[in-house]
Design a protein with these regions (language model features):
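Conserved hydrophobic/aromatic packing and binding residues within compact polymer-binding modules
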Residues: 7, 21-22, 32-35, 62
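Short, charged recognition helix plus adjacent turn
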Residues: 63-92
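Alpha-helix N-cap/N′ positions at the starts of helices
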Residues: 2, 27, 79-82
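A short, Lys/Arg-rich alpha-helix, primarily the initiator
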Residues: 1-13
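Short, basic-rich loop-to-helix N-cap that marks the start of a DNA-contacting helix
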Residues: 15-17, 23, 39-53, 69
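Recognition helix of helix-turn-helix/homeodomain-like DNA-binding domains
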Residues: 26-42, 65
Length: 93
């Protein structure tokens, strides 16, 4: 399932109206409706994190639905890549 559809299903399941949810996120209901209908790309990290908190779901799961790694995993991955590159320079071929 895609990000918007996942959030919409969870929001409806919990009985949270679109207007209330958008207000809690700090965005317009029109914008959030487009996100939920997959007419907008998944929102910036901060909104994904807030949506997860409001819905009580794992932030990592929503980031996966958004097609992105969570911010902490991005920095971990960056460090792994940097370490790998350093090791390739040091180790004999």
């Amino acid at each position: 399932m895609a990000f918007g559809l996942t959030v919409r299903a969870k929001r409806i399941e919990q009985g949270i109206g679109l207007n209330d949810f958008a207000e809690r996120l700090g965005v317009s209901p029109a914008y959030w409706s487009r996100v939920e209908r997959e007419q907008e790309k998944p929102p910036r990290d901060e909104l994904v994190e807030r949506a997860a908190a409001i819905l009580g779901v794992r932030m990592d799961d929503l980031f996966v639905e958004a097609g992105r790694l969570p911010p902490d995993m991005r920095s971990d991955l960056r460090r792994v890549v940097q370490t790998y590159r350093r090791m390739r320079q040091i180790l004999p071929k």
